[in-house]
Regions:
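Aromatic-capped interface at the extracytoplasmic side
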Residues: 1-5
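Terminal amphipathic helices with adjacent charged low-complexity linkers/tails
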Residues: 193, 206-230
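Extracytoplasmic/periplasmic solute-binding protein
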Residues: 231-239
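Conserved small/polar residues in nucleotide/adenosyl-binding loops
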Residues: 241-246
C-alpha cells in the first residue's frame, strides 16, 4: 500500500474549537486532496524531480541512461538520482527502511523492487493519485511530512494559498531537508529554489512574467517571521499548541 500513514491528532474544546495538536514522531502529516494542492506546487516538484512524470510508465529510462553516462564520465560517481516521483512515493511509504541500507547490494535490490512496483502501480492508479500521495508523504524538514503541514510550518498558511515563490521553496527542500532547510540554510535553499524556477520556465510550466515576479519575492524574510511567531507561541517537534488558540 503506497498510501501515507501516520497523521497528527487535533484536540478540540467542548465547543469544537481547536486548542492543541498532538504530534508523534513521524506522524506530523495532514492529508490534502490533489484539488487542494496548487498546480504550481505540483509542477515545481515535477520540474525539479521528474520532468517526464506525465509521460513515463513509472520508471524513466531516459533518466536512468543519463545518470549512468554521468556516473561513468565522473569516474564512477553514480550519485545522480534517476528515481521518478512514483518510485519516490514507494520509497517513502513501502521501503521505509531505506535509510538503514549499508551496502550497494542492499540499495540495488531495493531499487529493482522499487522500479518493478512503480510500473505495476502506474497500471492501477492515475498520475493524480500518485502526485497526491507523494505530496502527502514527503519529508520537508522541521518534523513536517507532506506539503500541508510544511506550508503551515514555513509560511503560516494553508497549502492552497501558496504563491509560486513559496511553492518553489518547498520543492527545493525535498532532496535534502536538512541542507536545504529554508530556516537554517536559506542561502542553500535559495540556490535550489532558483533551479526550480528555471526548470519550470524551461519546461513551460510558468511564463517569463511569473518567473520574474517569483524571483523578486523576498520570501525568506516571511519564513523567518513565521518561525519567530511559532517559537513565541511555544511550538516544538512533538507537541504544539494550535496557533489559533495562542493569539
Amino acid at each position: 500500500d503506497a498510501t501515507p500513514t501516520g497523521y497528527l491528532t487535533t484536540v478540540l474544546d467542548n465547543q469544537g474549537n481547536e486548542i492543541a495538536t498532538l504530534v508523534a514522531s513521524g506522524s506530523n502529516r495532514k492529508n490534502v486532496t490533489i484539488d487542494e494542492i496548487p498546480i504550481n506546487l505540483q509542477h515545481a516538484f515535477v520540474a525539479l524531480e521528474d520532468s517526464r512524470f506525465y509521460e513515463h510508465n513509472g520508471i524513466d529510462l531516459t533518466g536512468i541512461i543519463r545518470a549512468g553516462v554521468t556516473g561513468i564520465a565522473s569516474g564512477g560517481n553514480f550519485s545522480q538520482g534517476a528515481s521518478t516521483i512514483t518510485q519516490q512515493l514507494l520509497k517513502n511509504t513501502v521501503f521505509t527502511e531505506w535509510t538503514s541500507e549499508t551496502s550497494f547490494i542492499d540499495k540495488l535490490e531495493r531499487k529493482i523492487q522499487e522500479q518493478y512496483l512503480a510500473v505495476q502501480l502506474e497500471k492501477k492508479v492515475s498520475k493524480n493519485w500518485i502526485m497526491e500521495n507523494y505530496l502527502n508523504a514527503i519529508n520537508l524538514g522541521q518534523n513536517t511530512l507532506g506539503v500541508a503541514v510544511a506550508s503551515e510550518r514555513y509560511f503560516g498558511k494553508d497549502v492552497s494559498e501558496l504563491t509560486l515563490s513559496e511553492c518553489a521553496v518547498l520543492a527545493a527542500i525535498t532532496q535534502n531537508p536538512s541542507r536545504f532547510n529554508p530556516i537554517s540554510n536559506p542561502e542553500k535553499n535559495a540556490e535550489r529554489r532558483m533551479k526550480v524556477l528555471n526548470n519550470m520556465l524551461d519546461q513551460g510550466f510558468i511564463s517569463q512574467s511569473e518567473y520574474d515576479e517569483a524571483v523578486a519575492d523576498n520570501v525568506y524574510d516571511r519564513i523567518q517571521l513565521v518561525n519567530v511567531e511559532l517559537q513565541d507561541n511555544g511550538i516544538n517537534s512533538y507537541f504544539k499548541i494550535g496557533r489559533a488558540s495562542c493569539r
